[in-house]
From Swiss-Prot:
Name this protein carries in UniProt: Fe/S biogenesis protein NfuA
Function of the molecule: Involved in iron-sulfur cluster biogenesis. Binds a 4Fe-4S cluster, can transfer this cluster to apoproteins, and thereby intervenes in the maturation of Fe/S proteins. Could also act as a scaffold/chaperone for damaged Fe/S proteins.
InterPro entries linked: Fe/S_biogenesis_protein_NfuA (IPR017726), FeS_biogenesis (IPR000361), FSCA_dom_sf (IPR034904), HesB-like_dom_sf (IPR035903), NIF_FeS_clus_asmbl_NifU_C (IPR001075)
Species this chain originates from: Proteus mirabilis (strain HI4320)
Record-linked Pfam families: Fe-S_biosyn (PF01521), NifU (PF01106)
Length: 192
């Protein structure tokens, strides 16, 4: 479910040494399954453990996860990285905003998952987003762009060299390509 690297475990162990005995950590998601999902880590003293919590034991500590957050923390990783600028704790939870779908789920659900978990986080850095409108019978994903992507002069590159390439790589037997449904109108909202 959650991976905590050795460096992160060592960091948490130092912090926990200054807390009351048997205090562990809690990993959680606020607003799970929504575009506003946020992940966090907090101290979890013994009296804060709930009956429906899942305990994940690591070498140097335990992490508690509530049952609502658990499916959204699938494949999450906590690391403690050090570079020239200093050190920081990182928490990557690719499924926090959308629950991971099964490999045998319908194609439309699997494509939607990739768009929400991998593509939209990249587009968000430019204030953009993409939505899956439908998948045609002949295997084309029909997409609609919004935000900073609408009217952006780089949309063809994003569509063909970015999104289409990624989706065809992931679904080679099921998709033939992607098409843009958006009526692009350049404005102040456009990224380029």
């Amino acid at each position: 479910m959650i991976t905590i690297t050795d460096a992160a475990q060592a960091h948490f162990a130092k912090l926990l040494a200054n807390q009351e005995p048997n205090t562990q950590i809690r990993v959680f998601v606020i607003n799970p399954g929504t575009p506003n999902a946020e992940c966090g880590v907090s101290y979890c003293p013994p009296d804060a453990v709930e009956p429906n919590d899942t305990e994940i034991k690591f070498e140097k500590l335990s992490a508690y996860v509530d049952d609502i957050s658990a499916p959204f923390l699938e494949d999450a990783e906590i690391d403690f990285v050090t570079d020239q600028l200093g050190s920081q704790l990182t928490l990557k939870a690719p499924n926090a905003k959308m629950r991971k779908v099964a490999d045998d789920a319908p194609l439309i659900e699997r494509v939607e998952y990739v768009l929400q978990s991998q593509i939209n986080p990249q587009l968000a850095s430019h204030g953009g987003r993409v939505s899956l409108m439908e998948i045609t019978e002949d295997g084309y994903a029909i997409l609609q762009f919004g935000g900073g992507c609408n009217g952006c002069s780089m949309i063809d590159v994003t569509l063909k060299d970015g999104i289409e390439k990624e989706l065809l790589n992931l679904f080679p037997e099921e998709l033939k390509g992607v098409k843009d449904l958006t009526e692009h109108q350049r404005g102040d909202h456009s990224y380029y």
